[in-house]
Amino acid sequence: MIYREQYEWDSEKEALNIRKHGLDFDTAILVFEDENYIEWYDAAHSATEDRYNVLGMVHDVLFVVYTERRDRIRIISARLATNQERRLYFHDYHS
């Protein structure tokens, strides 16, 4: 179950994300309800803070980037998964 108070994000960043990817962050946090979601540390983008990538199913496979701040999950970006990411999700899900 998603508790909204566990999550946070910058509203301007969300507005940019909606314009660019058509996806709001209230929808993005639903990836964490997918019992088959895949998560990994993103070393390449973690110079200033630890970032994580998540693939999860919310009507379609979504790719979400987040960090942890003050015991909350802070959403950085969200979009539909690429074809390669979808293959990774379905391969891991069915393995």
PLM regions and their residue ranges:
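Ribonuclease/tRNase effector modules and their secretory precursors
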Residues: M1-S95
